[in-house]
Amino acid sequence: MSSISDLVNLNLSDSTERVIAEYIWVGGSGMDMRSKARTLSGPVKDPSKLPKWNYDGSSTGQAPGQDSEVILYPQTIFRDPFRRGNNILVMCDAYTPAGEPIPTNKRHNAAKIFSNPEVVAEEPWYGIEQEYTLLQKDVQWPVGWPLGGFPGPQGPYYCGIGANKAFGRDIVDSHYKACLYAGINISGINGEVMPGQWEFQVGPSVGISAADELWVARYILERITEIAGVVLSFDPKPIQGDWNGAGAHTNYSTKSMRNDGGYEVIKKAITKLEKRHKEHIAAYGEGNERRLTGKHETADMNTFIWGVANRGASIRVGRDTEKAGKGYFEDRRPASNMDPYVVTSMIAETTLLWKP
C-alpha cells in the first residue's frame, strides 16, 4: 500500500502527458497569497498560451457576494518544486470580468511603468533582500525562543551556526533549493540579527521580473512552512523591544548608474527620492512605523538621510560603488511586508520619469 509521501512524490510523466498548473495570486489583504490548481492537456512554457481562470472574490475579500467573479490573467511561469516533472507554478494578476484591474492588483500599474520607453532604455536592475520570521504555530512566538521567555541578547545570531543560535535552517535551505529549481533568480540566504529571523535575496533581476520572482519565492516559502508546521511572518516588527525588525531592502541600479560616471547619476536619483520621501514611506509597507525608529539599523521614518556604508540611513551607497564611481544603491526603507510591484515600480518612476 502506498503511503501519502509516495503519492505526493508520484511522477506523473511516466503515465500521462497531462500536467498540473498551480495558479497563484495576491489575496485581499494585499499580502496574503492564494492558489488553486488545474489540469492542462500538456506542457506549457508560454504564459500567453495558458487559459484565464476565475475565482470567488467574495471569499478572498476582493469582490462582493452578488458579483463575486474575479478573473486571473497568467503572467509568468515557474517550475513547480513540489510536484516537479512538467508541472508549473503560474503567477497571475486579477481583473474584474470587464477587464479592469482590481484594487489589490499592483502588477498592472507596475507593468505600465516598466514598459515606458524611458524606463526600458535604462534596464533597471533590482536585488531585493527579503527578511522574515519563523513562528511556532500554536503560540505565535519565534522558533528557538523559550515559551513565555526570551533568548540571550542579539549578537551571536546573525549568520550564526549551532543549535543554540540558528533556528529553522532546514526550512531555509529547502526554500533556497526549491527556488533554484523553480527558476527564480535567488542569490543567497543568511540568518538575521534576531534569532528565528532569516533573509533570502532575489536578483539582480530586470524590471517587473524582480517582483514576479519575489512573490513566487514568498509563495514557495509559505508552502514549505506549511509542510513544516511553522508559521511564516512578514511583520516588520514581530517582537517589540530591543530586537531588530524585518525589512525588504531594495538594491537598485540603471544602465546609466552602472556605466562610467554613474555615481553622479546615483546622487541625482537619491535627491529625487528625498523629495518624495513621504510618498515612498506611505507605500513601503504596513506597520513600518514600528520598524523605522532610528534604532536597530534603520533611519527614523520622518527623516531622510543617505550615506556611504551607513546602515542607519534611508539610502545606503556601498563603498565599492563610491570607489568605482558607478554601481548601485540600497533603499533600506521598505518593510518586509511591502508589495514588490509597488516598491520597484515606484523607485523607477521617481528616479527615471518624475520631474520635480
From Swiss-Prot:
Ranges for domain GS beta-grasp: 19-99
Recorded GO CC terms: cytoplasm
EC numbers: 6.3.1.2
Catalytic reaction annotation: L-glutamate + NH4(+) + ATP = L-glutamine + ADP + phosphate + H(+)
Domain of life: Eukaryota
Similarity remark: Belongs to the glutamine synthetase family.
Name this polypeptide is given: Glutamine synthetase N-1
Organism from which the protein derives: Phaseolus vulgaris
